A protein has these predicted regions:
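Alpha-helix-loop-beta-strand connector modules within alpha/beta enzyme cores
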Residues: 5, 47-64, 109-120
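Short, small-residue-enriched loops and turns at beta-alpha junctions
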Residues: 9-14, 37-45, 68-73, 94-99, ...
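Alpha/beta enzyme core
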Residues: 9-60, 78-85
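Glycine-rich phosphate-binding active-site loops on the catalytic face of alpha/beta enzymes
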Residues: 83-100
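Mobile "lid/hinge" segments at catalytic clefts and subdomain interfaces of large enzymes
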Residues: 100-104, 111-114
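Short, small-residue-biased leader/transition segments that mark boundaries at the very start
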Residues: 1-8
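Terminal or standalone catalytic/regulatory effector modules within metabolic enzymes
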Residues: 146-151, 156-204
Length: 204
C-alpha cells in the first residue's frame, strides 16, 4: 500500500509536518510514501530538503509525483533524485509538461552516466514517443494545458483541476474569465481553511 500526502499551503503544512506524517504512515503499514505535488508547487530546493529528511526518518521508498505546471517540475525531479528519492513520475514527451508530468526523456538524458542513471534507452523511448505523438494529435488536447503558467505558484491550482476548469470555461463560452477565476481561488481556499485542492475538494 502506498500512502500519499499532498504538498500545499506552506503556512499551514510545513516540512516537519510532512516528515511526522510519513513516520506515522510507515508505522501504520505503508509500503511507500508518495509526495503528491498536485500543482507543481514543490520547488526544487524544497524537494531536496524534504526528500533528504524523509529518507533519514523512514525506511520505506519515497515516491515523488509532480507536474510541470509552473515550469519547475524537471528541476524538482532532479533535486529529489540528488536527495535520494526512489521513484518519480514522468510522461513521454508528446503527453508531457504543463498540467501533465515532466518529460521522461529529459530526465533519462540528464541522469545518464550518473549514480542515478535510469538504465532506460533514449532511442527506444524516442520510438515510443513517436507513436504517442500521433495519439496526442488525435486527442485534440487544448494547448493551454501543456503550457507553463507561473501564476500557479500564486493560485495553487492542481493540474487536473486546471485542465477541467479550462474545459468548463470553454463550454460556458467564458474562457476570457480564466485569470479572474484563478485569482478568486486563493480567497475561497482561505475562507475554507486551506483545504488541499485535490478530489473531492477540486470537484466542488
Amino acid at each position: 500500500s502506498s500512502a500519499a500526502s499532498d504538498v500545499y499551503k506552506r503556512q499551514v503544512h510545513n516540512e516537519d509536518y510532512f516528515v511526522k506524517l510519513a513516520m506515522q504512515l510507515e508505522k501504520m503499514g505503508a509500503d511507500t510514501i508518495c509526495i503528491k505535488d498536485m500543482a507543481n508547487l514543490l520547488l526544487p530546493y524544497d524537494a531536496y530538503s524534504l526528500v533528504k529528511k524523509l529518507k533519514a526518518n523512514v525506511g520505506v521508498p519515497i515516491h515523488l509525483h509532480t507536474h510541470n505546471t509552473t515550469g519547475t517540475g524537471d528541476m524538482t525531479n532532479l533535486m529529489a533524485a540528488q536527495a535520494g528519492v526512489d521513484i518519480v513520475d514522468c510522461a513521454l514527451s508528446p503527453l508531457a509538461n504543463g498540467t501533465s508530468q515532466p518529460a521522461t526523456e529529459s530526465l533519462v538524458a540528464t541522469l545518464k552516466g550518473t549514480s542515478r542513471d535510469t538504465g532506460m534507452d533514449l532511442e527506444k523511448l524516442s520510438e515510443i514517443a513517436a507513436h504517442f505523438r500521433k495519439v496526442a494529435d488525435k486527442l485534440d488536447i487544448n494547448p493551454k494545458v501543456l503550457k507553463v503558467d507561473t501564476n500557479t505558484l500564486l493560485y495553487q491550482v492542481p493540474g487536473g483541476m486546471l485542465s477541467n476548469l479550462i474545459s468548463q470555461l470553454k463550454q460556458a463560452n467564458a474562457e476570457d474569465k480564466y485569470y479572474d477565476v484563478l485569482a478568486e481561488v486563493p480567497r475561497v481556499r482561505e475562507d475554507f481553511g486551506y483545504p488541499p485542492l485535490v478530489t473531492p475538494t477540486s470537484q466542488i
